[in-house]
């Protein structure tokens, strides 16, 4: 059977382990798909660019980043929820700073991977939860987690938000100090496909999603799942166990339309999208 190539982009984090397991055990090939994985450490903003340029067929994006970019013209659609549990963002500062509590961060810069990335959008939501609205000069682009480490070693007064388990080695080694956690009230990841990929490879997209759901379900039942995650992601076993206990991969492809509407409302209040579409109009523009 001839294999259909399918390009998928995602961050190098434990959430995406089911994709890698499916590649390694040949599960995608068994359904006629040659899955080509592209790791994108810069995150959602960079993957939105790949989708716009047609350089990937699918991408695993944080929900608010997916909603914002599609509403701002990205020729792609949400095809499925991927992780239904909310993303737990750690709020970090340099260990040599005098910053110790959320209130200390009001008015300070945020380090972000890039503009319109997950770290950028969530920093704006977090700042709003503290009662202030950042401006462009409140953001420092650091490209990725390692760039954040380098910048925060200077002990400049700034904050950086990234997923808690991923950043746990930095916190445990005393490279970052965590002063808060922030969980937005919506699912953390969506699977987004280009309209061209849906037109040309729609059946393969849905077969691939069926495979990855099966791999996620199998991973959740493995006795050694936490050990595997800790080894593959180079995080501590306690951090892996805590993350595995909380994560909920989507198992039926359903998209929470109410959650998408809440995301769009938050983005509009932050000035990141225009217009006030109804929930029905919003879903029609976002979801296939």
Q: Where in this protein do the model-derived segments appear?
A:
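Short, glycine-/small- and polar/acidic-enriched structural segments
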Residues: 2-132, 139-142, 158-164, 175-183
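Solvent-exposed, acidic/flexible segments
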Residues: 12, 44, 116, 120, ...
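Residue-level preference for well-ordered alpha-helical positions
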Residues: 127-128, 171, 230, 268
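Pocket-lining segment of extracytoplasmic ligand-binding domains
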Residues: 146-229
């Amino acid at each position: 059977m001839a294999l259909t190539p399918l390009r998928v982009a995602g961050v190098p984090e434990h959430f995406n382990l089911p994709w890698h397991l499916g590649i390694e055990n040949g599960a995608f090939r068994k359904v006629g798909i040659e899955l080509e994985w592209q790791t994108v450490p810069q995150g959602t903003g960079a993957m939105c660019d790949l989708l716009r340029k047609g350089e990937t067929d699918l991408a695993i994006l944080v929900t608010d980043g997916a909603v914002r970019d599609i509403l701002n013209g990205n020729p792609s659609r949400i095809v499925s929820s991927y992780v239904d549990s909310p993303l737990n963002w750690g709020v970090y500062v340099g260990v040599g700073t005098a910053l110790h509590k959320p209130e200390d961060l009001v008015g300070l810069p945020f380090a972000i991977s890039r503009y319109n990335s997950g770290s950028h959008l969530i920093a704006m939501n977090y700042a709003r939860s503290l009662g202030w609205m950042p401006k462009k000069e409140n953001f420092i682009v650091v490209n990725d987690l390692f760039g954040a480490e380098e910048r925060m070693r200077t002990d400049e007064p700034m904050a950086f938000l990234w997923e808690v388990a991923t950043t746990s080695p930095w916190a445990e080694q005393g490279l970052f100090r965590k002063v808060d956690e922030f969980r937005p009230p919506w699912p953390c990841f969506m699977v987004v496909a280009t309209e061209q990929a849906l037109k040309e490879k729609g059946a393969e997209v849905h077969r691939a999603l069926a495979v990855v759901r099966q791999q996620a379900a199998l991973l959740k039942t493995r006795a050694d799942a936490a050990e595997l995650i800790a080894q593959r992601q180079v995080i501590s076993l306690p951090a892996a166990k805590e993350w595995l206990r909380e994560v909920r991969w989507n198992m039926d492809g359903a998209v929470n339309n109410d959650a998408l509407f809440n995301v769009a409302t938050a983005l509009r209040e932050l000035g990141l999208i225009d217009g006030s579409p109804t929930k029905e109009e919003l879903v029609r523009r976002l979801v296939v």
